[in-house]
Amino acid sequence: MNRHLFILILLLLSCSNNAIEKKNLIKVQHPVSNISSAACVDFNSLNNKILNGLVQRDKALKEIQILLPKLRSYFYDNGGKDFTKASWVFPLEGYNSSVIGGENGSGYIASGYDYFDGNKHKGHPAQDIFIIDKNRDCLDDKKKKLVNVLSMTGGIVIATETVWDTTSNLRGGKYIWIYDPSSNSFFYYAHNSNVLVRPCDIIEPGETIATVGRTGLSAFKKRSPTHLHFMQLKLDKNNYPRPFNCYKDLISIMSKT
């Protein structure tokens, strides 16, 4: 086996094993109502179809338009709350906006991006948020432990991917999509080591939803520093998910230590 490939596999296994050990320590808020969770399951399924190019754009948009009212009802009926930006939390525990890649948010490139292009999308309408991890083992070099990914907003988990390996062409690796009815936005957290939530979970700002990892087509390669890929899509009047640069929000909100 190629020596460099062997090292990459060892690092990925280290990230994954460390995350699994941490998982049992995290408390996740699960809905308690008996109301059907079909809308969450359906959105997760739709997202998978979009990723794999198995559904046409117009049909996918119509499905989203049908699912959103059901998701909102499920959210509020199961104790979901609206939170203003004053309650939002920086998405990496123990870090702040100084670790956002680029200069003044320059890593954000919306041109060419369309959610409905799935795994073949163009652009980079997101902020990459880096941890201190020079040896690429998914551990903070100073604290020698995993870094928790926190939900920036409140919302409901609508899609996740919890399985990934180096043979996959999935760019986001292990990811989470959260719908926040308050801001009418989808929030995307990608390249995670371990996903700690599931579709239909009701989330509040600052809750641990994952640990930072190196999963994804490019993110697992040694040349890529360990980071969270964080994106916000705002829904327009037709509920079309449009890229929104949340850099100003990221630099203004408080970090959780």
Regions found by a protein language model. Name each.
Residues 15-148, 249-257:
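Polar/charged, compositionally biased leader and regulatory segments
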Residues 4-13:
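Sec-dependent N-terminal signal peptides
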Residues 169-178, 201-257:
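Conserved, short, structured surface segments that act as functional micro-motifs
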Residues 125, 143-146, 150-196, 226-227:
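Zn2+-dependent peptidoglycan hydrolase active-site motif and core
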Residues 118, 138-141, 165-170, 219-224:
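Short consensus segments that form the blades of beta-propeller domains
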